[in-house]
Amino acid sequence: MKVLHVYRTYFPDTQGGLEEVIRQICLGTRKQGVSSRVFTLSDEPFPAFLPRVEADVVRVRKTFEVASCGFALTGIRRFIKEVERADIVHYHYPWPFSDLLYLIAGQRKPAVLTYHSDIVRQKFLLAMYRPMMERYLGHMRRIIATSPNYFATSEILNGFAEKVDVIPIGLDEPSYPTTDERNRDLARVRETYGENYFLFVGVLRYYKGLHILLDAAKGAPYRVVIVGAGPVEAELRKQARIEGLDNVSFAGFVSDREKMALFGLCRAVVFPSYLRSEAFGVTLLEGAMSAKPLISAEVGSGTSHVNIHGDTGLVVEAGNHLALRDAMDVLHQDQGLADRMGQNARHRYEQLFTGKLMGERYKALYT
């Protein structure tokens, strides 16, 4: 079976949670006999065809961008060719240009769609786009929500409830660096950041709530390590500098091996996203896989499907830096509680969020 995934960006051009989700779907279904390709845009699509372990990547040049939505008018012909090759086309929402691609050429093959997030910020543009979006979603054979929480709270998904299935995101642990590989970086990570710090990993975007995390870290007797880069990085560094946050470290992008070493030495994973743009939180899954307790905010999304308050970690009021600080203080002061919650998080990962389970569910969807 040949599946064509369609999304606006992918490795190696960008690194983020949604790219990782697509990678994990490809890896999980590969073990079920599925051959995947990813059709995506790139500012520099050379080479245009890039074989990777999980999938072959087909890149076309991005022509222009509006409100973070890339367009590639010259790539339509290549898209048609890839659709003809595929048995099923798997779209990843939101990306309005993919609506156009589907309506122009995608109706030739069965289509499914993973609904990763509502459009939260661009209300005016959403009002203009909505008629096309509803037509697009209405044509899908099935629509996948990544958590029961998001399905329950999304107006758009509830409008297509008869088409919706829930398949939680899963991670294939063997696709991550091994313990031996991670251990090669442990000494350097320990020397740079120490141990028992609070760890954030992700693209530094407005909805991640990192300004709230910096407010919570002020005067704390422990370190906060922020891994990643992104659009609001300069603002965050300025805030940390002005407020004299010597206990906050910006690590930038790191290798997968170093990232897993950072998970290994942290006290807990902190994930302060405060808007529904944060639909799931792959970092929370990586923390759970690493047997670490989780701290997240309640935004009515999949973050609270991964992190169960009082069991796998602590869930706080969104946007409340005092509540976030209290949660970090609790886990900083009680190693035993942190360890128990970390083990519970690992158990929940094993029961619900493995790559194998996700791969089996998507293979069943495709067939």
Indicate where each model-derived feature is located.
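N-terminal strand-loop element at the rim of the active site
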Residues: 6-16, 20-70
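A conserved mid-protein helix/loop that constitutes part of the nucleotide-sugar donor-binding site
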Residues: 20, 24, 196-219, 231-237, ...
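Short His-centered aromatic/hydrophobic patch
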Residues: 91-98
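A short, active-site helix/loop in glycosyltransferases that binds the activated sugar's phosphate group
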Residues: 138-177
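Nucleotide-activated donor-binding/catalytic signature segment of Leloir-type glycosyltransferases, i.e.
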Residues: 234-257
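Acidic donor-binding loop of glycosyltransferase active sites
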Residues: 264-279, 292
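Short hydrophobic beta-strand element within catalytic cores of glycosyltransferases
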Residues: 289, 293-297
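Conserved acidic donor-binding segment of nucleotide-sugar-dependent glycosyltransferases
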Residues: 308-321, 328-335
